[in-house]
Structures are given as C-alpha cells and as structure tokens.
Amino acid sequence: MRTHFCGLVDETLIGQTVTLAGWTDVARNLGGVCFIDLRDHEGIVQVTVEPVAGDDASAELFKVAASLGYEDVLQVEGVVRARHAVNDKLRSGKVEVIATRISILNKAAPLPFHAHENPGEETRLKYRYLDLRRPEMQRMQRTRIKLVQALRRHLDARDFQDIETPILTKATPEGARDFLVPARMHPGEFYALPQSPQLFKQILMVAGFDRYYQIARCFRDEALRADRQLEFTQLDMEFAFVRERDVQDFVEDMIRAIFKEVVDVDLAAQFPRMTWAEAMRRYGSDKPDLRIALELVDVAELVKASQFPVFTAAADDADGRVAALLIPGGASLSRKQIDEYAAHAAKYGAKGLAYIKLSETGEVSSPIAKFFSEESFAALLKHVGASNGDIVFFGAGGYTKVSDFMGALRLKAGKDFNLVADGWAPLWVTDFPMFEWDDEAQRYVALHHPFTAPAVDDIADLRANARTAVSRGYDMVLNGNEIGGGSIRIHRPDMQSAVFELLGIGAEEARAKFGFLLDALNYGAPPHGGIAFGIDRIAALMAGTESIRDVIPFPKTTGAQDLMTDAPSPIAADQLAEVHVQVRPKQV
C-alpha cells in the first residue's frame, strides 16, 4: 500500500512518484490550494493539492482534500518536489508531495483530543490508542523498544541463554501481595502470578545452564505510584560460579554500552561504590541522587549538652540519630514554606522539624536556639558549615526514621533550590543489612529477599549476630532511582534453612512453600548470583519522563484500573462457578 514512509521522504526522491499511507495530522484549505500534513510512525510530510483549471480529475481531488478531517486515514500517490518554504522542524521539510491521487481508507470520528494536545491523564489512558499516536509518546515507546533490542543483542552475543519461566506458579512470600489465579481442575487451590522469576532462575543454575536471562513480566499486588505498576517488566539475569564483582563488572559494562547505544550517553568509566551504611549516613537513602551535593551531618555529640529533650533523648539512644541538613541560601524560606518542609517530613514519619535560619546579616531565627549555650550553639553552626543566608534543618529520633525523612527533605531542597546538577550519576550500593526488624510482626524480615546470601559462611555466627548481619546484596542506582537489584544467592541447603528459621519460617512451613528449592540445593547447587533491572524505570530515565506510565504502552492508573478496557470488571456467576469461587457481596 506504500512505497515510502512519510517522515523519510527527502531530496533524494525529488521528481519521483511515491505512494504514502498515514493519518491526517493537519489539513488546511487555503482556497486555491490544500495542504495536508500526512503522518506515520516515521514523521510528517507535506502533501499539496493544486487544482488545475478545466481539469475535472484535479477538481475532484481538491474536493476530497478539502473534506479531510483530523486523523482520517489516507493513501496518497504523488510526485516529490522541492518546497519553496523550507520547514526546518521536519526531516522532510525540504520537500513536498504533489498529490495525484488520494484514497480515504477510513474516516475518523470527532476526536476527544488532537495528537498535538496534552489532555488529562484519565482521558489519555481511556483513549490510549490516540494518546500513543502523539509524537512524544511515539518517541518514548521507541526508546523502550530500542532498549530491549539492545539488551537482547548484548546478552545474546555473550552466550547468555534466553529461557522462559512459568507465569502460573506457586504462591511464595517475596514481600508484596501475590495475584492469585484459581485452579479450575483443583478446587480450592490457586496459582500465583510471579513477582519475579527468582526461584526458577536459581533452579536453572542448579540445572547447569550457567548464564541465563529473560525479559520477564512480573506481577505485584501493591499500591501504585509514578514508578510502580501492578505488572512490570524486568531484565532478569543469573550467573553460575560468580562472586559479587563478577556480576557487577559485567552488568556495569552492559549498562554503560546500552546507554551509549540507545541515547548516546557516556556514563562514568567506573561507577562509584558506597555501602548501604554510608549511603544512609550521608544521604538518608539507599538510592541516593548524587547529582545533589547536599549531605546529612550527624550532630548527636554536639547536642548532648543542650537542654532540648527531643535532641538529647535521640543522642543518648544507641539506635537514635540527630541529623542536620544545611541548605545554602535557604534563609529565603518564609515561615509558610518552612511549615511546608515540616509537612513533607511528616509524610516520612517526622514528628517535628527543628531549624536554624541565619539572615544575610547574621540574625538568628530558630525555635531551638534558647536550648543551647552561646558556645555550644556556635560550635553546632560551625560543625554543619552554616553561613549567613543559610538554613539548617534538624531531625531527631530513631536512626532509620530520621534518615528517611531527612533524606526526603534533601531531595525536596535539591529541586526547590535548583541544586540538581545536569548529567548522569550512577552508583553501586553494597553491603545491605541481611535483615530488618518488623515491630508489628515482632520478627526479622529480609531486606532484599530470603534467598540472598549472608556475608558470613558460618551459621552459628549468623544466628548470634542476626541484628547486624550484612548480606551479599547490591543495587545499581542512577540519578536517585534504583534501576537494578541483585545478590549472591544462598546455595547451601543448611544455610537456606537457617535463614528461613531466622525469618520466622519454621521447617514445616519452609518445606511446604519452598521444598522444591531446598531439594534442588541438596543436589549440588553451584555458587551463583544475579541481578534484575527494571526495564520500565530505565526506559523512563532514557526518555526523560518521571512516570513509567509514559513508557508502558497500556499502563494502569494509580487506582489499579485499565480505563481503556474497563478492567477489572465483574465476572459472570457461571464463570466463577467453573473455578469454584464465590464472591462476597460488597459491604455498603
């Protein structure tokens, strides 16, 4: 139906007859001439219709052109000629196509929005097929496509094996809530959709496949936000007979090569490395954005002599923290803006936010100054590096909570004060804690997942020091986004059983949920490790958008709905009966 793509028609085709197909982006009838911007996935070319006096065929052609509306689907035949007025905004802007025939393949109904408009998100998602026609959306989807193609080429060339793993599998606790699928042939029993291929890829290492990858669809029934979806895509990888640096060096080279190929970005020749403890201490985050130069400063020792009980209690607590965040030029914040910072910190667990503001003339404004002697107050300001015109925020309380809300303030201040440097800041975060304590459940939970190997090989040592145990986990961070997470896995069945026990998973429960894994580890499992990269998140970074919904063709809303297909939706009673499911009536 076509000989060329619209966006690729150029000067080399001048004088030639071409057949094009696409959508009417814009149609303009200027009386004596019609101009049609014809669009396909490669871009736009101008089609010109010039009636010839006394020529019935050209008059009919002009009549067809004059009747066109937005998004009508056309086939156009014509001759390429040089344009009198060049349009530098188009690749085809030096030429136009003089139409000799126009066929309307399909008329478009009146549109809810035009391809060059940017309507509200609900409208965009309801008419996603129209939204995806917009040039910006085409660009972002193409970025994602190029990313996946480049990853496949890179791994195929290095002897990785692309192996599929099951979508219908066993429900196993991996942190988030499972999506469950009733098993019609086994009444009362359910499959789960995979949160990741984690256990299957480990078993593939036991099976001797050595190097595995998969562009895997994963499912987690969790709250949605800009960087999370119920279903998402990850590059899943696993290596046999490796240590941490083997995996890290390989995937660092891969990510560097992929960014160069897909978006022509040169990432650092060597990614900096930082332990989890250092990242939390300096930045209040295990995925710090290194483009922001601001750092947290511990001030517990300097506030112990104060008379402020919130500070002294946290400073004297072995699990407490008193941290300061200096914002250069922050004295410009009004009281209302300071209250907004306090409200922002409260979202992350802060019960209050102290501050010291120094005017350009050195005048102090602070609700906590009265609790310090003149000498200790001066020492505090010197320690944090405060100068006239600055503001210092303080957080006090439990170490983790203070780190979280002060880290959130750091990000807010970086954006508010234009302190986010241009460019790309990759980072390895290593040596994560093996466990974290869940106050509600009164037990340890795995910080990564239950299959991450501890840094120690001795089970007695792990049991005796579970609270401070370090794992062999690692994350790759880019511009404050965790784009990849991995670890060396547990390959010994006795160590895996011990970790289950520390997580409150008894032998009977472990056998019921993970018996297949424990059995596999018993039959000669090699040391192995891997990593998984979030395709959606990397594509969003490459495309320059903050929401992964922009790089997913058919995403869900934050309310977990597909507005285009109206999913989820009720199921007929006979279908429910077939899978032995009875739905409780909604509570009014």
UniProtKB/Swiss-Prot annotation:
Any one GO molecular-function label of the UniProt entry: aspartate-tRNA ligase activity
Binding positions for ATP per the UniProt entry: R220, D221, E222, Q229, E482, G534, I535, D536, R537
Domain of life from the UniProt record: Bacteria
Gene Ontology cellular component terms for the protein in this record: cytoplasm
Chief location: cytoplasm
PROSITE patterns: AA_TRNA_LIGASE_II
Annotated localization: Cytoplasm
One Pfam assignment: tRNA-synt_2
EC number: 6.1.1.12
Substrates-to-products reaction catalysed: tRNA(Asp) + L-aspartate + ATP = L-aspartyl-tRNA(Asp) + AMP + diphosphate
Coiled-coil boundaries: none
Assembly and oligomerization: Homodimer.
Biological role: Catalyzes the attachment of L-aspartate to tRNA(Asp) in a two-step reaction: L-aspartate is first activated by ATP to form Asp-AMP and then transferred to the acceptor end of tRNA(Asp).
Annotated protein name in UniProt: Aspartate--tRNA ligase
